A protein has these predicted regions:
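A short, gly/pro- and small-residue-rich
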Residues: 122-134
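N-terminal beta1-alpha1-beta2 submodule of the flavodoxin-like/Rossmannoid cofactor-binding fold
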Residues: 1-124, 197-201, 219-225
Length: 225
C-alpha cells in the first residue's frame, strides 16, 4: 500500500464583497470555500493500492488582485498576462503563482454564477496563465447560488473554458443551491443531513482518478505533447 499526495489548486471565482440591500453575508462563497478546503485537508481516499490525500493551495481574486497580490500589477483587466513576458521578466508574485499552477496535479473551481455565466474575476485570474500550465490535468467544478439553480449555468459555461485551458473537467458537478442555508461563514455545516453535501465526494473521486491516471501516463510517456 502506497500513498500519493495530489497538489490541488483551488480557484475561488467571485470577488464580490458587499452585503446586499436585503441583508445577509457580504460574501456568500466564504462558507462553501472554507468547507471545501476543510474537506480536502482531511480527505484520505483509497484508489487501487494507493491512499490519496491533498496538498491544497487556494487562489482567491480578493487576494490575488489586491495591492501586493500576485496579479496586482496586471489587474483584473488582464493588462499583462504571464505568457506575454519573456522568461524571468514576469513580476515575482505572478511568476510564483505560475509555478504553483504548473506544479499542480489537479484543480477545483469554486464559483458563483454571474449573468448565466462565470464571474469576470475568475476568467481573468485563470486567463492570466497559458494553457501549457494547465494542460493534461483534471478539474472539478463546484458552483453555488442563493437561488434554487445552484449556479449550474456557471458550471455549463466553465466546461468549454476549462477545456480550452487544457484542464478537462470531471463529468460530475457540485451545484449547491440556497447555499446560505447550508454553510456558516466559517465553513461549518448547518445541517449534516443535507443531501447536497454528498456532491463533493463524487466530484473528488472523479478528479482523483483522472489526476492519478494522467500522472501515470506522463510518467510512462516521459512528458506530454
Amino acid at each position: 500500500m502506497t500513498s500519493r499526495v495530489l497538489k490541488t489548486v483551488v480557484f475561488m471565482g467571485s470577488a464580490r464583497d458587499i452585503s446586499p440591500p436585503w441583508g445577509g453575508s457580504s460574501r456568500l462563497g466564504n462558507g462553501i470555500l472554507a468547507w471545501v478546503k476543510t474537506e480536502l485537508a482531511k480527505r484520505s481516499a483509497q484508489l487501487g493500492d494507493e491512499t490519496i490525500t491533498h496538498e491544497v493551495t487556494v487562489f482567491d481574486p480578493l487576494d490575488v488582485f489586491a495591492p501586493g497580490g500576485a496579479l496586482a500589477e496586471s489587474g483584473a483587466e488582464l493588462k499583462t498576462p504571464h505568457f506575454f513576458f519573456k522568461a524571468g521578466e514576469a513580476p515575482a508574485g505572478m511568476e510564483a503563482m505560475a509555478q504553483t499552477i504548473k506544479a499542480a496535479d489537479c484543480f477545483l473551481i469554486v464559483t458563483a454564477e454571474y449573468n448565466h455565466s462565470l464571474p469576470p474575476a475568475l476568467s481573468s485570474m485563470m486567463g492570466h496563465f497559458g494553457g501549457s500550465l494547465y494542460k493534461f490535468k483534471p478539474s472539478g467544478i463546484i458552483t453555488y447560488s442563493p437561488s434554487p439553480y445552484g449556479g449550474s449555468r456557471a458550471a455549463v459555461a466553465l466546461r468549454p473554458f476549462l477545456s480550452e485551458l487544457g484542464c478537462l473537467s470531471a463529468s460530475k458537478l457540485g451545484c449547491f443551491s440556497m447555499v446560505g442555508d447550508i454553510f456558516n461563514e466559517d465553513g461549518s455545516v448547518k445541517d449534516e443531513s443535507n443531501r447536497q453535501l454528498k456532491q463533493l465526494p463524487g466530484v473528488l473521486e472523479q478528479v482523483e482518478w483522472l489526476a492519478v491516471a494522467m500522472l501515470k501516463q506522463k510518467e510512462a510517456c516521459g512528458g506530454c505533447p
